[in-house]
Amino acid sequence: MRILIVEDEYVSRRFLYKFMKEYGECDVTVNGKEAIEAFIISLEDENPYDLILLDIMMPEIDGMKVLKTIRLMERDRGIIGHERVKIIMTTALNESENVMEAFDEGCEAYAAKPLDTKKLISVMEKLNLI
């Protein structure tokens, strides 16, 4: 499984990397701009990500805008349904409006920080990633 971790906060980024590397090849970006660039490169190389763990509050471009941009790029390239990358939003913002907006924009799951690894495993199983 190819995984992109998008997290600006060092401790969270390191935690996610150490945990997720057991499930696949992980790339890490520290802001939304880098995330979009990494996603484009993965498509151009015909080696797309299977999963993106995407923080909402980040510098450059926030996670909601990254989510919207990725879904638009997929749509424009004819990537639909189960072929789309699975996106799990990871954030300390657990307000219902943020959760609803993320689902409206096309994320598959929403994980509040601090992350519970057992719940994350369960979500990945439900998404047929593991």
Each language-model region and where it sits:
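Conserved acidic carboxylate
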Residues: 7
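Helix N-cap/capping motif at the beta->alpha junctions
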Residues: 10, 28-41, 63
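Two-component/phosphorelay signaling modules centered on CheY-like receiver
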Residues: 10-28
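Short amphipathic alpha-helix used as the core "switch/output" element in two-component signaling
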Residues: 37, 64-82
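Receiver (REC) domain active-site loop signature in two-component systems and cognate sites
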Residues: 58
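Alpha4 helix (beta4-alpha4-beta5 surface) of REC/receiver domains from two-component response regulators
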Residues: 82-83, 94-109, 122
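C-terminal output helix
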Residues: 115-124
